[in-house]
């Protein structure tokens, strides 16, 4: 059902390595190019002594500022610093990570200070960039968005993504799974009978496989499986390791000591990987890579396929379980749709084709764009734009990626909502006490497929107190699990005889204390937005003074004019121009008013002299050949704003250096047991 929303709505694919945004216009999806003309934007955020850069501008300067350029923030959401995946990736990240109470945190130097950010804060900055890309295209404010997440994202990661949207000033209409969004892109115009479609989504850092049935506008997810840490960046890492060893072998030098050299090599490896999707061989050429040594090498497609063979074979592992869960055979799959840039790799396509007995994958849609495309369609529907014939009767039925349950006596996982259950959904079950006269119960909530809770992921917990003294097994406690359309998980428990009730929205240990943190981040975003705007105006004033000074110098040196100005006047202007340029070089961070004051000083000397010259020329019949090199104009306009490439208002330095404080106590508490 459409929501009552104001303002424009967009669909955003918030990717690990690249992000993409679309809007519904003229009865179709428009995937929007950014200010560099690219339809995907790097999910990079860089911090310097003066500004924050996002997207292409951040990625372009990463070799020079590696320690303060953050990427891959998405997989960090909801992962602790001690997580094996985080520890395995640290060696590939030049930026610093530290351990927060809830998850790993990112530490950078920004404007001369050490700042700590949560991963969702970095994601919110990328979302701000995508919103601004859309606003530049539409010409109006964007207020609402549908944002996609990997199908394997757990409840807390989905909530954190929603939080990132809120910090970015967006009303998040819905969080939807990436493979489901891609299926919409494939099936929007498909009419006719039921079709079973396998979405094979291999991106930069995530991998999902989903099986959907599409029939007359109804998209129903039958099953989903994933590898939570597999993608194009793993292939890049193999190439980097290969060439690092080659450089060491040839030159007896270890480039892993130098982050700038490593970053330049990684960029070249990513380019080579892309080349190998269409060519049998790729060349690596990097001038002065390390200690003044030029590095040249080649890599063949066969060698690349061999070094990444285990990863490529790993992409096939989730496919069979997805078919099994959906109760379908290979022959019953009508289409295999490729999503994500890494599906361009020929070996991946070949393995997939071999698995489906020679059936070729569908390559009719650009693998970089279908996720944003599907999110845009969903945004159009949810914002009430369903008057379009194409959008009418379209229904999206997603599933929960993991089983949800609670701990009963003995640490047993009792499942209430099974994996691949269609959402939204609601399920209740009755439990009782484990001991006589037990005054309360501790309800611990888990997600996962293992029989014991210790092997699953703890989502949250809460107490239900005030149970009257009764023998064990007598109290009747109704526990209800409720998952909404965003996949957000709500749990309530009621003791029947007293009506005592308690409930929780599972947001990964973030019940009440989380809200004020989000509010603080939002207010910081507003604060730094105005600060960034002021910095933008300051740089415009600096550029205006610089352009005025150099234009004035060019005017004095112009062949047609230099003889028209008396030497004393010319020297007065030249001395003041030189003084101003020297002052500019020494005062790159001055205030707007200082730049404007310096420009007025320069104008005070130059304007009377130039006016006298032009007046004399006018009396003599005009300036020969016109008046080239007129200084001045509009300060801040000539040459654009070189100091702000891709920089975006709304930064949120500061973070939360100590991590979030705990909201509830230890694991100890009275147990609960299942009622037969």
Curated annotation (Swiss-Prot):
Species name: Bremia lactucae (Lettuce downy mildew)
Highest rank taxon of the organism: Eukaryota
Keyword ATP-binding: yes
Protein name in the entry: Heat shock 70 kDa protein
Lineage, uppermost ranks: Eukaryota, Sar, Stramenopiles, Oomycota, Peronosporales
Keyword Mitochondrion on entry: no
Protein family membership: Belongs to the heat shock protein 70 family.
Key words of the record: ATP-binding, Chaperone, Nucleotide-binding, Stress response
Classification via InterPro entries: ATPase_NBD (IPR043129), Heat_shock_70_CS (IPR018181), HSP70_C_sf (IPR029048), HSP70_peptide-bd_sf (IPR029047), Hsp_70_fam (IPR013126)
Region entry Disordered, spans: 657-676
PANTHER family per UniProt: HEAT SHOCK PROTEIN 70KDA
GO molecular function: ATP binding; ATP-dependent protein folding chaperone
PROSITE patterns: HSP70_1, HSP70_2, HSP70_3
């Amino acid at each position: 059902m459409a929501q009552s929303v104001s303002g424009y709505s967009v669909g955003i694919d918030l990717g690990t390595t690249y992000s993409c945004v679309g809007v519904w216009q003229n009865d179709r999806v428009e995937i929007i190019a950014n200010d560099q003309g690219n339809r995907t934007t790097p999910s990079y955020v860089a911090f310097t002594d003066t500004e924050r850069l996002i997207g292409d501008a951040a990625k372009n300067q990463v070799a020079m500022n590696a320690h303060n350029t953050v990427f891959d923030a998405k997989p960090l959401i909801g992962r602790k610093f001690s997580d094996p995946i985080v520890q395995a990736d640290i060696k590939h990240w030049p930026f610093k990570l530290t351990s927060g109470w809830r998850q790993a945190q990112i530490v950078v130097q920004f404007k001369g200070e050490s700042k700590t950010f949560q991963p969702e804060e970095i994601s919110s900055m990328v979302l701000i960039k995508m919103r601004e890309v859309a606003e530049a295209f539409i010409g109006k404010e964007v207020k609402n968005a549908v944002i996609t997440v990997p199908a394997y994202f757990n409840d807390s990661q989905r909530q954190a993504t929603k939080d990132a949207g809120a910090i970015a000033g967006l009303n998040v209409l819905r969080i939807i799974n990436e493979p489901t969004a891609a299926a919409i892109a494939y099936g929007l115009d498909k009419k006719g009978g039921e079709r079973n479609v396998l979405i094979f989504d291999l991106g930069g850092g995530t991998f999902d496989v989903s099986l959907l049935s599409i029939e007359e506008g109804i998209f129903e997810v039958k099953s989903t499986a994933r590898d939570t840490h597999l993608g194009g960046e793993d292939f890049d890492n193999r190439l980097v390791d290969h060439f690092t060893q080659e450089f060491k072998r040839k030159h007896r030098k270890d480039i892993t000591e130098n982050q700038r050299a490593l970053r330049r090599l990684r960029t070249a490896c990513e380019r080579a990987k892309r080349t190998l999707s269409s060519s049998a061989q790729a060349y690596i050429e990097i001038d002065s890579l390390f200690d003044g040594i030029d590095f040249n090498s080649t890599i063949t497609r066969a060698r690349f396929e061999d070094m990444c063979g285990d990863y490529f074979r790993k992409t096939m592992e989730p496919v069979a379980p997805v078919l099994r869960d959906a109760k379908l055979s290979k022959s019953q799959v009508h289409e295999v749709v490729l999503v994500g840039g890494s599906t361009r790799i020929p070996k991946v396509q070949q393995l997939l084709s071999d698995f489906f007995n020679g059936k070729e994958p569908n390559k009719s849609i650009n693998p970089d764009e279908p996720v944003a495309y599907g999110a845009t369609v969903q945004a159009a529907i949810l914002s009430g734009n369903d008057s379009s014939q194409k959008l009418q009767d379209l229904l999206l039925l997603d599933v929960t990626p993991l089983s949800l349950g609670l701990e009963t006596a003995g640490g047993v996982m009792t499942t209430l909502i099974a994996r691949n259950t269609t959402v939204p959904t609601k399920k209740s079950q009755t439990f009782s006490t484990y001991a006589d006269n037990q005054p309360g119960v501790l309800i611990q909530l888990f997600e996962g497929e293992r029989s014991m809770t210790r092997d699953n992921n703890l989502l949250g917990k809460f107490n239900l107190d005030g149970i009257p003294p009764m023998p064990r097994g007598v109290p009747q406690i109704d526990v209800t699990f409720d998952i909404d359309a965003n996949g957000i998980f709500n749990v309530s428990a009621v003791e029947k005889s007293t009506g005592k009730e308690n409930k929780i929205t599972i947001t990964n240990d973030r019940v009440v204390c989380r809200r004020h943190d989000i509010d603080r981040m939002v207010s910081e975003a507003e604060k730094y937005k105005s600060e960034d705007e002021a910095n933008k105006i300051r740089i415009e004033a600096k550029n205006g003074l610089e352009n005025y000074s150099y234009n004035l110098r060019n005017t004095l040196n112009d062949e047609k004019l230099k003889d028209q100005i008396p030497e004393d006047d010319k020297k007065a202007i030249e001395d003041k121009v030189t003084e101003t340029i020297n002052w500019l070089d020494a005062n790159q961070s001055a205030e707007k008013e200082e730049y404007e004051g310096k420009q007025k000083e320069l104008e005070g000397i130059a304007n009377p002299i130039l006016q006298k010259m032009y007046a004399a020329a006018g009396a003599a019949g005009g300036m020969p050949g016109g008046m080239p090199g007129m200084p001045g104009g509009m300060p801040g306009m000539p040459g654009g704003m070189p100091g702000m490439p891709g920089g975006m208002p709304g930064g949120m330095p500061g973070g939360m250096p100590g991590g979030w404080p705990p909201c509830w106590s230890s694991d100890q508490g009275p147990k609960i047991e299942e009622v037969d």
